[in-house]
């Protein structure tokens, strides 16, 4: 890749709020929804077990999916980059199909003209097609993922660039007006304990620097402080140029090799 890639992860629901359990033996698994308004319940037979197995029920809500769509589209507008949503709606016709339909509705009613004015696009793709395309493209796009897909693909993309170190992590509200910026890799306790023991360490500081620069950039955006935004962009560019110039920590150096 020659340009950055943004993974938009819908950090709500699906496997991360699922109810899973062991099936002890033969029997029938049912899924049932009981409306609060007194209407008839909706019930589906999930499986007839002939012996022990496993089961899981997961969910999501329209309000959260719509909010995620708005956040992704706003992020794309900020960067002037196209936005892609990946699902497996050919298999999960109702579940993933809902993501696809709600994204399209939000785009058509709230963002279509804004994207057209900036000459950028939105498109839904099957997850397997999107993964293959991402491997071939040069970067420069926002990839909207369901919760589990975003968890996995963010690490794939990070390692594709060489390390989690130069990666930024930004949480954005649907309206784009509240931001939390953090280091993507969390803390480096293991490195610090080694340092306390007097051992040599090589810790990449760039994610921590970028956590501040992203926060400052958005502060500048909200305050219409162009100088602060320019400072943030220049500091990030200097960090990238430093790495590309050959000054880097051990993790990246091992991947670059003699190049």
List PLM regions with ranges:
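Short coil/turn connectors at secondary-structure junctions
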Residues: 1-4, 28-29, 79-81, 117-119, ...
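Short beta-strand segments
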Residues: 6-10, 86, 145-147, 182
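Glycine-rich phosphate/diphosphate-binding loop of Rossmann-like nucleotide-binding domains
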Residues: 31-125
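Short glycine/threonine-rich loop-to-helix capping motif typified by GTGT followed
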Residues: 93-104, 134-142, 148, 158, ...
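Glycine-rich phosphate/nucleotide-binding loop
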Residues: 134-234, 241-242
